[in-house]
Amino acid sequence: MKSPEAEVFRDSISTVTQDGKRAWIFPKKPSGRYYNWRKIVSYFLLTILFISPFIKINGNQFIMINVLERRFNIFGQPFWPQDFHLVVISMLIGVLFVVFFTVAYGRIFCGWICPQTIFMEMVFRRIEYWIEGDRGKQIRLKKAPWNAEKIKKRVIKWIVFFIISFLIANVFLAYLIGSDQLLKYMIDGPKYHLSTFISLLIFTAVFYFVFAWFREQVCVIACPYGRLQGVLLDNKSIVVAYDYKRGEKEKGRAKFKKSENREASGKGDCIDCAQCVHVCPTGIDIRNGTQLECVNCTACIDACDSMMEKVGLPKGLIRYASEENIEKKTKFEFTPRLKGYSVVLGVLIAVLVGMLFLRNDIEARILRLPGQLYEHKEGSNISNVFTYKLVNKTTQNIEDVSFKLLSHDGFIKVVNDEVNVPAQELAEGTLFIEIDSNLLKEEKDKVEIGIYSGSHLIETTTTTFLGPRSFN
């Protein structure tokens, strides 16, 4: 059974032709109230993105995700693999936030905050307008033969795109290996850091491919967030929507005619100018309703408002609204489902904040040496050998470290007399614990150990002490 002509858009995407070839999108340069606000938000976020790797707090990079060395800085606070439980909680909160936010506000994130949209629409697209001109000029340039003008414009655009992609790749690398290390590599030159330079070129090629060729296909094909809409959106979700009740009315949309009483004639307020289609960065017609390709960028809102103002009709034909708002002309309602998500999200955030505040400055792990049994000492004393690992999560050296038994009478002998843990480093070694066997209750006893810096207790940990089966 074939779909009606009006429903064809539901069975295909706007960026692919009927014969399966790429349909290049040439959106008209947007302008308007929402676009101006998006520029402010976008350039603010871009500024944060580009300067964050070079900001230091207490000697720590503001944000660093060094997977190779397993060192992470979030807002200037160092995190280690031992803090992985915090990452799990954060990811869980992030997933729930995406669900909660999408249920309530659709893909507003995509249009306002997503790095792909910001770079594509506020950086690369604006460069394209500057070099090649607006929609009409770009279409004519694409159809034109490869003459001197076309070669000149395309080469200039490709060079500028490559330079910006290279710059983005450098910033991306600064997040991965640290800005200090990146600057050192740049001063030394690629000759001495060939693997890093090759990685930089690979990142550059990926960014260039995404923004020069793949472009809006990322949002339409590659990004899983768009696919979630079908599961998460309902008729109460706020999206960029066309008010079909007002736009169509009894006789549907029609071209604008001066001095015509559209209300009396039963014509809708939509004058079928197609400006909302021409300005769309993914090439859809928002009048067909919510679609997979829509990133809620508001370009169609600005274009429609501009046309409504010119023809003397009320603005808001395309606006932020839900299906229920348009159908029943009601206001946004905080549904029980949203309330449930909010409660769960609030609890998880409270747990995460609590765990961050209770996070210790030092991580201690003391484990019995594998394959080693206990050893009899003088009198009734039993000795076990252990390995210790101390991770200093702070920017200060921890000096004069000592170990003391808190749960049993006995003593601890460290192989190295002096233990110091440098800032953001770890210290490892061996120690012996000696306890009177008469104090042991089981074959394997839990013992509590205190780690001190001078006389100050900085951490406690437990380990298993092995003794004989009989204590008589």
Feature locations, PLM:
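Intrinsically disordered, low-complexity Pro/Gly/Ser/Thr-rich segments with frequent PxxP/GP/PP motifs
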Residues: 413-438
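Asparagine-centered strand-capping/turn motif at beta-strand->loop junctions
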Residues: 390-394
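Hydrophobic alpha-helical transmembrane segments in integral membrane proteins
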Residues: 350-374
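Terminal connector regions
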Residues: 436-472
